[in-house]
Structures are given as structure tokens and as C-alpha cells.
Amino acid sequence: MSEKLEANFADTLRVSSFIESINGKIVDDYVIDTDKLGKKTINFEFVNEDGIKIKYSYVIDVVDKEAPLIWLGKSYNVTKGSEDYLLDKIMCGDNYDSNPKCYIEGEYNLDEVGSYKLVFKAEDSSGNKAEKNFTLNVNEPKKGGSNSNTEKVTTDFSQIVKDYKNDDTQIGIDVSKWQGDIDFSKLKASGVEFVIIRVGSSNGLNGENFVDSKFIQNVKNANAVGIPVGIYFYSYASTIDRAISDAKWIVEQIKDYKVDLPIAFDWENWGSFNKFDVSFFGLTNIAKGFMDTIKDAGYDAMLYSSKTYLENIWLPTSYPVWLAHYTKNTNYTGEYSFWQMCSNGRVDGISGDVDINIRYIEK
């Protein structure tokens, strides 16, 4: 056996992970459950060189050694006279602890313009600590509008097709009410190969669900011209039960339409994360609860998120990823099935900006 039988919380480990050598073969090298802290007995069987099956066990200690994450740069700007919501607005989360202790050291006055040198500190229930030095800039309110004459940069759909379309990719878009009335015949003529449509969202944390005002129009028209459809739901779920309920609600909304592509769980409440009382592990399980329910209903599911949050917050799941990373060449090293590459796309059939996506086809 290994000398130190210790497992990090939520790590993927098997029975054999703690065994340096064995006189035989393990019968079932199963994945150990490391979702709870504390001592855990690992029971297993192995067949020795004489063909005799032997029962064995060992004890591991599941521990949390990961410090909280403070989502904060070198400076933070507020307007003079603002209410003191710093501990609400500055994201402070943890892989295990849903409510790490977060506090700010140093003096500041939100009613007085100036720069204040402060330290944001955090400690989780396992005693892991993190801290960040930052400058709080209290600024005078801005007067008047912007005088910028900078020309708006857009991305032409046809150029994306030219640059990224091949035998292994499809080029499409995602839409919601913000795109207004869409001419799907023009989209198809422009080469749009799929569309991911927002089915709806919730009225904030613990709010009621609502159907996107253009959803029915969009899904009917996409079906009518034969553009393959995927779905996304902008979630405010803070519990697994709510995520499951949301998924069942979505299935009811889409049951009369043709949906061939995955249904995406889209959770982006990072600016108000502290109000959700959820750990990163808990948030990942919320997403899994949603996606499991979608899968059980006969649809494919996937997780939507940006590169930064995929790398720092979300834990791995068995579901595909819809990556958001606005760049010509993503350096995201994880696996992904869809890539939302820009939000300033232009295509005939939509009067304003639209997100352009690349789908990677599994052979």
C-alpha cells in the first residue's frame, strides 16, 4: 500500500490508486467516492497467483486542501456614493465549502474619492486560506455620454464559413429574443447549418420560469426550413432539485418541435455568485442534475460556459462542452463539441449582431 492514504476531495481515484503492488489481480477496480470528507473504508477483492479470491480493505482520508477562489484583479472600481456591496459583488467561492468566510482588511470610504489599498481574505471550512491585495478606486460619477467615434467591429458569417468550414465542422448561430424577427429562409441561403435557440430563463434566483418571447416563432421557422435545432436555457438554479425541475419544464416546452442537437445548461451568474450559497462542486452537480434529466427524456445535453470558468470553476462531467471563447484560435485545452467564437456576427436574415458557433462533428 502507499504510505499516505489520503485523497483530495472530488478527485477521480480507483481502488488501485493506493496500491503500489499486489500479488494477484483486483476483481473490480472501481472508482472511489471522494465526494465527502473524512475517513472511508475501501473494500475490494483480488485473485492471487493461486487463483484464490481474497477480500481486503484499507482506509483513506478524504481531505480538502484547495484554497478558496477570490475572483479579483489588482484593482476594483466603484462610483462615489455607492452602497457597500463589495462582499456581494467580488466573487469568493470554494470547491467544497458553499459559504467560505470572506472579508476585507483595511479602511475605505465610498463617499470620498480616492484609492484605498486593501486585502481581500477568504477561509474555507477546512482551514484553507487565500488572500489578494487590491486597490479600491472610488471615482466621481461620469458625466455625459460617450464621445467615442470608434467604428464597430463585426464578423461576417461568410468569412467564418470560408475560414473554418470543413468536412468535420458545421457553422451555425445561437439566437434569442434579442435578435428580433429572424428570416430563417435567408439564414439557410446564407449557409447557416444549425441554430441553438433560447427556450427561456427564470426571473432571477428562485424566480418563475418564462418562455423566451421569440422561442416559438424561432423554433417553428427553423423547423420549417430544415435548419437543425439545439436549445439553451439561461439558468439561475441554486439547487439540484431546481435544475431538475427546470429541465422537465424545458422538455414540456419543446416536445412539439424537432430538436436534433443538444440542450445546453447555461449558468452565468458569476457577478452574483456569492448569493447562491453553492460550492463549485455543488454547482457542477446542479448542472449534472439538469443534464441527466434532459438525457433521461431522450435528448442530448451539454454544458455552456466560457473558457475562464471552465478552467477555474467547473469540475469535469461526462457531458459535452459548448465553449464560449471570443477569438480566432482558442487555446482552451479541454474537450468541446461546440465553440461560440464571437458575439458580433452578421448574417443575412438578422438585422443586428448574433453569436457565431462552430460545431465539431463526431465521426
Residue ranges and their predicted role:
Residues 1-23, 64-98:
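Solvent-exposed, low-complexity, repeat-rich "mucin-like" stalks and linkers
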Residues 17-58, 97-138:
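Serine/threonine-rich, repeat-prone extracellular segments and beta-strand-based repeat modules
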Residues 61-69, 137-146:
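Extracellular interdomain linker/stem segments of modular secreted and single-pass surface proteins
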Residues 145-177, 316-363:
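Functionally critical loop-and-helix segments that line ligand-binding/catalytic clefts
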Residues 165-289, 295-297:
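Substrate-binding cleft of extracellular glycoside hydrolase catalytic domains
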Residues 229, 300-301, 321:
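Hydrophobic anchor at the start of a short beta-strand
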Residues 247-255, 314-323:
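Short, electropositive alpha-helical surface patch
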Residues 294, 298-311:
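Aromatic-lined carbohydrate-recognition surfaces of secreted/lumenal glycan-active proteins
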